């Protein structure tokens, strides 16, 4: 290790630590019989963030490219069959298959989380379920191993970001976060590998949206990396009455900045049931709130293609319900 560390192109060597991951989602299977308008079950969560008005003006994500990085993606559900997937990359195996490939992956539901997340942006099943940016183009990157959490996954995350930027991503949605090898003092916007990565991506013009984290009722309490980045849109979770979910992580960052930036439905959020090709479910977590906001960002980009990533971020914050009095629970609303 000493010899490697002394090589001129090596900046630093860090130990790899890990722990077994537990699911951050609460599951409740629902029969798809409850429908309302063309949005189906998605109506309330779409109206809650004022997306319906944008759709009615013709902004549905057309021509905007969204990178979704997660645990993997199954595209066999009826509402996902026709979505416009441009490229896929399994960073773990370095191939182009992001759905479950092995018996082990099937056993642990590897692509479950990513499929649910993707569906809230991309689904296109009028009368049943519609995503926020259903006409967008999608890049899908599988960066996470659900069986464990290791620091290598931050490198996978950054590799996915680089791949997405090289392939023309306008928006990145990442319902992922890292804290187990960090202290709260590291949530300063300049320390975590993924935090640095999203700031670089934003500087290159990519609107970066990430989940704030589900630590609000734990001893950690605060947002997790990369939600501490100063250029990211971190997203907290609220219920259908706009009340913050108890699990939603809070700010501030360790250097005093307000977090999260905004909130969306993350309590009993409608999505596809990843274990079915026809049914829908309600899941809870900032993981579900994040893609709703990422989809909204794509609509803004379609409407204002000349805006920078930071201008899109500012527009979302300044037009949110709490913009006049932002705090470390709801952010700007």
What are these regions, as identified by a protein language model?
Residues 289-305:
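Short, small-residue alpha-helix embedded
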